[in-house]
Amino acid sequence: MTIAKDSMVNDGIRAREVRLIASDGEQLGVKSRQEAMQIAEDASLDLVLVAPKAKPPVARIMDYGKYRFEQQKKDREARKKQKVVSIKEVRLSPAIDTNDFNTKLKHAEKFLSKGDKVRVSIRFKGRAITHKDIGRQVLNRMIEATKEFSTVEAYPKMDGRSMFLVLAPKTDK
């Protein structure tokens, strides 16, 4: 627990007056800090500052341990829902045959359906580097074949002796 969070509870509250909210949500009005602490102590609960920037600051009477547990639970749930997107790679050659292309296309479809991004790359070997237009045609063919279920994130570009593009899965909005 950080020091900043500690200072928002019970004796850590520095404000002279607070707008007090009871544990059931009832507004108790503006009270002195000592009076609010006494009310919280009588209820065997904690006084927690929920809106420190308000004038006067808003404090609520609650079980701080339970509140912290609920916050941690919400944070864990939020982290679970975050998806880590990985980039998968499909390698092609400039002189790729139709059946080989279809196989690589199925691999790209599988990766995109799982929610991963796909980097499609063509490696030019030897003198093939002089035929960049053929490589661009192959990548454009891949874009056309996957346009129903993907969007182009990075259009074909050269990087050394290879040309690549990045496809991302289409999001339903």
Curated annotation (Swiss-Prot):
Record-given protein name: Translation initiation factor IF-3
InterPro entries: T_IF-3_C_sf, T_IF-3_N_sf, Translation_initiation_fac3_CS, Translation_initiation_fac_3, Translation_initiation_fac_3_C, Translation_initiation_fac_3_N
Role: IF-3 binds to the 30S ribosomal subunit and shifts the equilibrium between 70S ribosomes and their 50S and 30S subunits in favor of the free subunits, thus enhancing the availability of 30S subunits on which protein synthesis initiation begins.
Oligomeric and partner information: Monomer.
Protein biosynthesis in keyword set: yes
SUPFAM superfamilies: Translation initiation factor IF3, C-terminal domain (SSF55200), Translation initiation factor IF3, N-terminal domain (SSF54364)
Highest taxon, organism lineage: Bacteria
Gene name in the database record: infC
GO molecular function: ribosome binding; translation initiation factor activity
Keyword match Transmembrane helix: no
Location within or outside the cell: Cytoplasm
Entry similarity comment: Belongs to the IF-3 family.
Keywords on record: Cytoplasm, Initiation factor, Protein biosynthesis
Source species of the chain: Lactiplantibacillus plantarum (strain ATCC BAA-793 / NCIMB 8826 / WCFS1) (Lactobacillus plantarum)
NCBIfam families the UniProt entry points to: infC
UniProt GO cellular component terms: cytosol; membrane
Protein's GO biological process: ribosome disassembly
Gene3D superfamilies: Translation initiation factor 3 (IF-3), C-terminal domain (3.30.110.10), Translation initiation factor 3 (IF-3), N-terminal domain (3.10.20.80)
